[in-house]
Amino acid sequence: MEHKDDDDDDVSFAKWMSSFWGHSWREEDQRGLRERHRPQATSHRKTSLPCPLPVLPRIPSSDRHPRRHSHEDQEFRCRSSDRLPRRHSHEDQKFRCRSHVRDYGEYSEDGSFKEPLESKGRSHSKIEKFSESFERQLCFRTKRSASLGPESRKERNERECLRMEIKSRKKVEEERSSRKEEHGEAHMAPLFEKGPE
């Protein structure tokens, strides 16, 4: 008995939904549209997209990295695909397929994944850029305060302390980077001396 009530509820809900979306539930049922709502093949879904997708080689799931796609990227892809199809070389496909990996690493010719060399120095360059921008702001503030009137002794002392702090941070960073380079070279030297065994 309860089973029949559940079916009635489902039917009434389906009728309400179909009336809400502006089509008749009975007409759909008569035309057999319910049987047609099976999962579609990927080829059918691809043909129904507004712009064709380029054929790219599959990347193993272990090599995939998340990438955010902006609205401009989608517009660019749609506009570029509107042009006449052109033949892509193997290198073009590699580039298109793996361009999102450029921040994470690169592939060698044999297909193995390598960490980028620049990532090690990237943090150092960010620190340098930050300290330079900080110095520029500091200079701008001192010029502005000088134009407003004579500096107080307190302001001058603060400015000198900031300059000394910046210089000491730069020295520490340079020492760290030189130690890392020396340390890296020290580890690499014995490897080259041994040679193949």
UniProtKB/Swiss-Prot annotation:
Domain of life: Eukaryota
InterPro entries tied to this protein: LNP1
Start-end of Basic residues biased regions: 34-47
Basic and acidic residues compositional bias, start-end: 70-128, 167-186
Disulfide cysteine pairs (residue numbers): none
PANTHER family in UniProt: LEUKEMIA NUP98 FUSION PARTNER 1 (PTHR35667:SF1)
Protein name: Leukemia NUP98 fusion partner 1 homolog
Lineage: Eukaryota, Metazoa, Chordata, Craniata, Vertebrata
Gene it is expressed from: LNP1
